[in-house]
Design a protein with these regions (language model features):
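N-terminal secretory signal peptides that target proteins for export/translocation
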Residues: 1-11
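Bacterial N-terminal signal peptides
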Residues: 14-26
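Electrostatic cytochrome c docking/interface patches
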Residues: 28-45, 162-191
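The canonical Cys-X-X-Cys-His
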Residues: 40, 46-56, 95, 130, ...
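Detector for the c-type heme attachment site
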Residues: 52-58, 100-101, 135-136, 199-205, ...
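Electron-transfer interface patches adjacent to heme c in soluble/periplasmic c-type cytochromes
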Residues: 68-97, 117-127, 207, 213-247
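Hydrophobic or amphipathic alpha-helical targeting/insertion segments
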Residues: 127-134
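Extended, well-folded interaction surfaces typified by the phenylalanyl-tRNA synthetase beta subunit core
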Residues: 142-158
């Protein structure tokens, strides 16, 4: 299984290593450290913002990454604090609405390639700190990435309003009081900022995640996001904590 997963791994080991570091080395203590900018940097790594919002050879968060989907090719946006090409003119309320509801400052809908259905779980504090980080610590990039141009009728962004009615989740994460604080922290990260299900859950014909097959593995164009459920045969149920840590850092386990 490890070899199969390794053979289909995209060339983003460095990003996965940073992600692993954020979860296993920084941990909850770092997430609760003082300073919105430091916490925002932690949330940005946990949310893997740079992976989609940075094109190969491009500047961090400047957008332009081409994402091929069954609906057409989408390009990620510039999310640096540029007031002309990025999100520099976004208020915190504008930012929160884009991140958690998929609605831009101008009122137009984002496509669910942006995982706002997962980010809706994020706490107000995490969104606040993420906003502070982008506005104060990210370098502004004064350039516009390629624009997404999808065929009719998906080029009508207003159609996303109906999709959102059916599939958008507007609830923040609710801890399970019967579980440990460690379990709840892991559930929050997996379901919210880390948005594991965005890649590892198969999608229906309307491109919605199939909740009945949550984290069961999904095809993503030229590569495959494997089953990461607790199933001991097809999933990672037999993996130890160290196995998971090693895989996230290196892309394989022995």
């Amino acid at each position: 299984m490890a070899k199969m997963m390794h053979s289909r791994l995209p060339d983003r080991i460095t990003l996965l290593g940073a992600f692993c570091t954020s979860i296993f080395l920084y941990g909850t203590a770092s997430a609760q450290s003082d300073g919105s900018t430091d916490r925002g940097a932690y949330i940005a790594v946990t949310s893997d913002c740079v992976a989609c919002h940075t094109a190969p050879g491009g500047k961090p968060f400047s957008g332009g990454l081409a994402m091929k989907t069954p609906l057409g090719t989408m390009y990620s946006t510039n999310i640096t604090p540029s007031r002309t090409f990025g999100i520099g003119d976004y208020s915190e309320a504008d930012f929160s609405r884009a991140v958690r509801k998929g609605i831009r400052k101008d009122g137009r809908n984002l496509y669910p390639a942006m995982p706002y259905t997962a980010y809706s779980y994020m706490t107000d504090q995490d969104v606040h700190d993420l906003y502070v980080y982008f506005m104060k610590s990210v370098q502004s990039v004064e350039s516009a990435p390629s624009k997404t141009s999808l065929p009719f009728p998906m080029n009508i962004r207003g159609s996303m309003m109906f999709w959102n009615v059916l599939f958008r989740n507007d609830r923040t994460f609710q801890p399970d009081p019967s579980r440990s604080s460690e379990w709840n922290r892991g559930a929050y990260l997996a379901q919210g900022p880390a948005h594991c299900g965005t890649c590892h859950t198969p999608r229906g014909f309307l491109m919605q995640e199939k909740s009945s097959k949550d984290l069961g593995g999904a095809s993503l164009g030229a590569w495959y996001a494997p089953n990461i459920t607790s199933d001991k045969i097809s999933g990672i149920g037999n993996w130890s904590r160290e196995n998971i840590k090693t895989y996230l850092k290196t892309g394989h386990i022995d």
